[in-house]
Amino acid sequence: MQYNFKVEAFEGPLDLLLHLIHRYEIDIYNIPVAEITEQYLSYVHTMKELQLDVASEYLVMAATLLQIKSKMLLPKHEEDVLDNGDDFIDDPRQELMERLIEYKKYKQVATELKEREQERAQLYTRPPIDFTSLQQEEETSLPLDVTLYDMLAAFQKLMRRKKAKKPVTTRITRQEIPIEQRMTDILKQLEIQGGRQSFYDLFVDDEREIMVVTFLAVLELMKNQQIVIEQEHNFDEIFVSSYTKSA
């Protein structure tokens, strides 16, 4: 099975790091590099397993994190001072911390500008202009509160749960299901369930190939705005609703 899925909601490695900092309530001024590196690499590994189009920037950041981690493990000596004569030891995390703080400010400003734009749009009665032809790139983004990083975390949890339950002697029979067919199956399943269902209940089959196809089908349905993903709080169960049900 080969299915490359590129989604603009992946804004870059700094966005993923901020997501991890928020998700695990990490102090941005005192980042536990070992833990954040492990989580980051886990996400990147899952993205590659799902054959998502992982930009090279993610791999560069992975190398940077590993380098910082190795520096943090080195013994500190009094002679390890900065070239400018300062009498303190340079923190290997300093540059990354500054980049994250700047990026966080940028994200906040961008969010505020978007909210103001939406407020202004509500003040006008003029029919909206069709910019469809100019929005080819924007069509791949996911206009949802639940991010793709949340979805990846849920998929990781699901894979761990399935692996724990699976008997060692189970024989895997390879099956290939088209993404489009699985999308149709999910929509029918939601209709039977009254328009809303737990994300985990979509994965009734333990075969890895089918689980991957199901996850990619969910992403495609999200992109097409045929389903909505809901999560009350961080780490809560994720629910999938048909778009008509949530409207």
Curated annotation (Swiss-Prot):
One of its GO terms (biological process) is chromosome segregation. Pfam families: SMC_ScpA (PF02616). Its main location: cytoplasm. It comes from the Bacteria. It is found in: Cytoplasm. Keywords: Cell cycle, Cell division, Chromosome partition, Cytoplasm. GO terms for cellular component: cytoplasm. HAMAP family: ScpA (MF_01805). Participates in chromosomal partition during cell division. May act via the formation of a condensin-like complex containing Smc and ScpB that pull DNA away from mid-cell into both cell halves. Component of a cohesin-like complex composed of ScpA, ScpB and the Smc homodimer, in which ScpA and ScpB bind to the head domain of Smc. The presence of the three proteins is required for the association of the complex with DNA. Belongs to the ScpA family. NCBIfam families: PRK00104.1-1, PRK00104.1-4. This is Segregation and condensation protein A.
